Amino acid sequence: MAQVTVGENEGVESALRRFKRAVSKAGIFSDLKRIRHHETPVEKYKRKAQQRRRSRRR
């Protein structure tokens, strides 16, 4: 779950920007897209291969 605490002198726009970045980094939207639609075995293989490549980079 992405969580952002807003500071006293921080604007809403910058907090929203940080929240969007945290959501994209956590991969929440990609999970939602995957759950919403049927995933074929080929798509599942490609997704897992991409996850493996990402984890190797870090």
Swiss-Prot record:
Instruction: Provide the alphabetized UniProt keywords.
Output: Ribonucleoprotein, Ribosomal protein
Please name the GO terms of the biological process aspect recorded for this protein, alphabetically.
translation
Q: Name one Pfam family in it.
A: Ribosomal_S21
Q: Which InterPro entries match?
A: Ribosomal_bS21, Ribosomal_bS21_CS, Ribosomal_bS21_sf
Query: Is Nucleotidyltransferase found in the keyword set?
Result: no
Q: Name one GO molecular function term.
A: structural constituent of ribosome
Does the record's keyword annotation contain Ribonucleoprotein? Answer: yes
Q: Where is the composition biased (Basic residues)?
A: 45-58
Listed GO CC annotations: ribonucleoprotein complex; ribosome
Give me the ranges of the annotated region Disordered: 31-58
* Top-rank taxon: Bacteria
PANTHER family hit by this protein? MITOCHONDRIAL 28S RIBOSOMAL PROTEIN S21 (PTHR21109), SMALL RIBOSOMAL SUBUNIT PROTEIN BS21M (PTHR21109:SF0)
What family is reported? Answer: Belongs to the bacterial ribosomal protein bS21 family.
| Name listed for the protein in its UniProt record | Small ribosomal subunit protein bS21
Q: Which organism is it from?
A: Prochlorococcus marinus (strain MIT 9313)
What high-level taxonomic lineage is stated for the organism?
Bacteria, Bacillati, Cyanobacteriota, Cyanophyceae, Synechococcales
